[in-house]
Amino acid sequence: MQGPRSTGDSSTGINYADGEPICSTNSETTSNNILNPVDVQFPNNTTGSGRPTYASSSSHVVQNHNWWSFGESSSRLGPSDHLNSNGSKTDRQLLSDGYGFEEGQSGMLLPGESFLRGSSSSHMLSHVNLGKDMDIGSGLQTSGVVIRHNNCETSLGSSSQTAEERSSGPGSSLGGLGSSCKRKALEGAPSHSFPGESHGCFFQTENGAWNEGLAQYDASSSLSLSMPSQNSPNVNNQSGLPEPRFGLGGGRAVTASAFPSTRSTETISRPGRRLNPGQPPESVAFSFTQSGSSVRQQQQLPATSPFVDPLDARAIPVTGSSSSGDGQPSMIHLPALTRNIHQFAWSASSSSRANSMPEEGLSPWDAPRINSEQPVFTTPANETRNPVQDQFCWSFTRGNPSTSGDSPFVPRAGSSSGIHGLQPNPTWVTPHNQSRISEVAPWSLFPSIESESATHGASLPLLPTGPSVSSNEAAAPSGSSSRSHRSRQRRSGLLLERQNDHLHLRHLGRSLAADNDGRNRLISEIRQVLSAMRRGENLRFEDYMVFDPLIYQGMAEMHDRHRDMRLDVDNMSYEELLALGERIGDVSTGLSEEVILKVMKQHKHTSSAAGSHQDMEPCCVCQEEYAEGDDLGTLGCGHEFHTACVKQWLMLKNLCPICKTVALST
């Protein structure tokens, strides 16, 4: 859907009346060639006494390149994306040294050091680039925003010029600002690539006005402060005072001195720097207050501070009551920054929505280097899309509560704000797991120690909170992280070793306790044996074993002199008995033949006598039956044998072969 083509011009006049700046903008526009134009209404900025008057503009001018965008910070802007203001009324305003414009308006007044804030759903500026050459409209080329400051009047110029012309007068018209209410709702839309422009980043000037290295990255928004050259025709200061030049892509608030908002009680200011290299280094003191704030320049900074706002820059909601009470400001002094931190570029791995850089764009390695004296700040943005409307509860505590002076501060946000502490010593962001960097809350250069300890898988290094940190330590976080990892491993190893030692000691203690119990029982038994010996009681062999358990084994190994006497003859075999008899020898216990014949009874065997003794057994010595007329001998036990057989037996043993009793008594 296209409307009629529009042509028009707009001018802005800035004057001082009664000590207060008054800004006005006249615009005559007719809409043409704008997608779904929506009328943007701008209220009259009438404020109380002592407050600056703001200008408003509703011009719709077609521009070919992205310049100012009040849309979503994560959206990629095409050639038709311009100053996007959906008419939403918020309480945040764009602050300056007495000038500014309220959100919901497309007017712009930047005579001096500025505080910029967006007005869309994300409340951030997506692409803001001041002091750059760019094409605006059809066939027109401007030298960017020319800011002049005079003692009696201030003007903001962005007039249409050719490449050879530059603005030089004390006043100029405000032109080339286009606004469109068509918002890019689809994230990840590819942005238009321009010659000398990094993908979704800053423009490269053709006249060398911005010759210092611009921090660039491949993300949907950016924030950079660059130092223009001293001889740039775009930077003109009639009063001889240094004027700031800001290049803003992330829409974060950048200020060197800002007034409190007329309608917001809370003001959050980001660090700002004057960008004139001819002036001595100066610093900015940061002020975070509840009802109002003033930023004072107190601490020295070495040089300009280019700010890099990576990933999806989200708005920081500043809410509160409409009353503008005077609160007690909390001044935060930024310590001396490191001088040896070089520029780094955000590549395609910096965000899940980031795309690779085009071939015609500037690569991260082709970008000009930042001055070695320029510290680099990195601000991870919040991934949340809707701004949090809770009040901020800032508390600023040092790493050491008892430390005073210029010690590094550790501001921490309250639970309702969801904003982590601002660390004073920036360090590098490791490329590992950079897709999760967007989860870090806004206004946090790096997550605090509490969040680091809560997320163990995080790749961001821990920042020290002690009194001071040297530049070498800040420049080499990888070595410190590796050393800390090794120290943690060493501590864990020592802890495990101590636990093992503790378990070993516990086991040893139990064994010693058991040994002590056994020894106590042994001592008691020895005492009982000794007392029994004193009483003269008969002691058993076990009683003697109490004194020494080895006594029994020694006694078993001793030579037994009566071993042969203790032989178990009854259980021996016949062979063993023969061997034993041969070894022992013959022991004659028998009787002589004369004694046997004299004492032993003899008679003849007859068959009549055999009939009466039918149960008569044969001779036990020779095992033969008795025959008629054989000589038989009768022993004292009554057993009968052949006389020749029994006489030989009795000569060996005086024992009865049957009953083993004494055969003959002499």
From Swiss-Prot:
GO terms for biological process: flower development; proteasome-mediated ubiquitin-dependent protein catabolic process; protein ubiquitination; vegetative to reproductive phase transition of meristem. It catalyses: S-ubiquitinyl-[E2 ubiquitin-conjugating enzyme]-L-cysteine + [acceptor protein]-L-lysine = [E2 ubiquitin-conjugating enzyme]-L-cysteine + N(6)-ubiquitinyl-[acceptor protein]-L-lysine. Changing residue 639 to A: Unable to promote MED25 degradation. A zinc finger (RING-type) spans 619-660. Residues 221-239 have a biased composition (Low complexity). GO terms for molecular function: ubiquitin protein ligase activity; zinc ion binding. It comes from the Eukaryota. E3 ubiquitin-protein ligase that functions as a regulator of MED25 stability by targeting MED25 for degradation in a RING-H2-dependent way. Proteasome-dependent degradation of MED25 seems to activate its function as positive regulator of FLOWERING LOCUS T (FT) and is important to induce the expression of FT and consequently to promote flowering. May function downstream of HAL3 and be required for HAL3-regulated plant growth. Activation of MBR2 by HAL3 may lead to the degradation of cell cycle suppressors, resulting in enhancement of cell division and plant growth. This is E3 ubiquitin-protein ligase MBR2. The gene is MBR2.
